[in-house]
Design a protein with these regions (language model features):
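Small-residue (G/S/T/A) turn/hinge positions that recur once per unit in extracellular repeat modules
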Residues: 160, 184, 215-216, 224, ...
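Sec-dependent, cleavable N-terminal signal peptides
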Residues: 1-38
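Long, low-complexity, polar and repeat-rich extracellular regions
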Residues: 281-285, 311
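Fold-core signature of tandem repeat domains
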Residues: 179, 189, 194, 211, ...
């Protein structure tokens, strides 16, 4: 009997241990659900919301055995918002919509604000592909988000850090913006057409803002930080054209705008201008980086007003580097009040980008072998500045169409004056107009200088 009792006790112990292990396993599964990213695949262009945001299944219609659930973009965003993932875990929204060609999603009201990190990837739609061209854009976009029926709403409003939106055409959110970032940090907006159809050439489909960045609507002290619009590789290029304004910063710190076409068709050459500014930096926005080297340079052209406008006195530190800026209705770069801001002695004034003084070009000559550009800069004494030089055709002389190169100079400690001579790597044709900008290293870029016509060297 004792042996039998011990045997039964042992069996109970093993059984209890097994039950405990099972409970721990279940508890572990429940406790670690948040450690795994979820993927939701949009398979319907409809606009119904999710039936049950607690089941980790995107289903905008009741679940039926043996039938794949319908998943709309609205339902997918609701699931991504409510699946209890950790803030460091990024969900993915993919697309697999039946039918050939472009699939259009037309919400009847604004889509939910994105509160949890998510990667919304239009290039997952079968047949879509990223841009591979260094010049121009051959991306195949097959998902269009159209706001004609959405009322006063943005196409997508991202309020979650570490989110990405790529591969979408976003059109006709005319009362607001195509994509908004509200207090979100470290997000990427890349490979989209904002304000034009997936063809990348169609006018009349613009948003109020192609893209806007603003402080968080529930926490105004939370500014968007370190987001990248575009990027330095071909697949990251956005076409932001045909809107009222291309990109607007209503706040933010250390955001980047790189490699985009702002105001052109996807060719990067033809006119599809935004009706107002190509880009505007407002309301305590600081340290925006616009452009860069190589593929990070933006093309900003054909916009109805300024190419880049920084009117707000409390918006400082922005760098506008090596872009192609031309054929805009206003100035290529406009600081402060509308129109050219005059230089002042030692650049003692303050305001947007500190109202940085621009260089004064005294001569520009071309010989049979080279081009020589001379001039002066008067600005903050004993300070290192980066000068950037551009050439322009005579028909559009006073912006910066073709970047020629840069030069560092150091102003005199007493007078704030420095003279310079710059020779670009390739000679510039007689008749071209030269302009230049000045920046404190790579901060607080000035307006373009007055143009100087290239003449033959005697």
């Amino acid at each position: 009997m004792m042996g039998s009792g011990l045997h039964i006790a042992a069996r109970r112990t093993v059984l209890l241990f097994g039950v405990l292990l099972g409970m721990l396993a279940v508890a572990s599964m429940v406790g670690t659900k948040t450690a795994y990213a979820s993927t939701f695949t949009v398979n319907s262009t409809g606009d119904k919301g999710d039936q049950d945001t607690n089941n980790l299944v995107c289903n905008s219609t009741p679940l039926q055995p043996g039938i794949d659930p319908e998943c709309t973009l609205r339902a997918a965003i609701e699931q991504a918002n409510d699946n209890d993932n950790e803030a460091t875990t990024v969900d993915t929204i993919k697309f697999s919509l039946g039918g050939d060609g472009v699939q259009t999603i037309s919400p009847n009201t604004g889509l939910p604000v994105v509160f949890e990190p998510v990667n919304i990837d239009g290039y997952t739609q079968p047949g879509a592909s990223e841009n591979t061209l260094a010049v121009g854009d051959n991306a195949v976009l097959l998902i269009r988000l159209d706001g004609k029926a959405a009322g006063f709403a943005s196409g997508l409003n991202i309020a979650a850090d570490d989110s990405t939106v790529r591969g979408l055409s976003v059109t006709r959110f005319s009362f607001s913006g195509g994509i908004g970032l509200s207090g979100a940090d470290n997000c990427k907006i890349e490979g989209n057409f904002l304000g034009t159809s997936p063809r990348g050439t169609t006018a009349g489909l613009g948003n109020g803002f192609g893209l806007y960045l603003q402080n968080h609507f529930a926490n105004p002290s939370d500014s968007p930080l370190a987001n990248t619009i575009g990027g330095a590789s071909p697949e990251a290029r956005n076409v932001i054209s045909g809107n009222s304004t291309g990109i607007t910063f209503f706040g933010g710190l250390e955001n980047k705008v790189e490699g985009n076409y702002i105001g052109t068709t996807k060719s990067g050459i033809d006119d599809l201008g935004n009706s107002a500014r190509g880009m505007e930096v407002l309301a305590e926005t600081r340290d925006v980086s616009i452009g860069g080297t190589g593929a990070a340079r933006n093309t900003i052209a054909f916009n109805g007003q300024d190419g880049v406008g920084i009117p707000s006195a409390d918006s400082t530190g922005s760098s506008i580097m090596s872009n192609s800026i031309f054929s805009n209705g206003g100035l290529g770069i406009d600081l402060g009040a509308s129109g050219r801001t005059a230089n002042d002695p030692d650049d003692a004034d303050t305001g947007s980008n500190n109202l940085q003084n621009f260089p004064v070009l005294s001569s520009a000559t071309t010989s049979s072998r080279s081009t020589t550009i001379k001039g002066t800069l008067n600005s903050t004494p004993d300070t290192i500045f980066t000068l950037r030089f551009y050439s322009n055709p005579s028909s559009i002389p006073d912006e910066g169409k073709k970047f020629l190169g840069l030069k560092s100079v150091h102003t005199d400690a007493t007078s704030g004056e420095v003279s310079f001579t710059f020779r670009p790597g390739k000679k510039v044709a007689v008749g071209q107009r030269i302009t230049a900008t000045a920046a404190e290293l790579d901060s607080n870029t000035s307006e373009f200088s007055n143009p100087r016509r290239i003449v033959a060297q005697q």
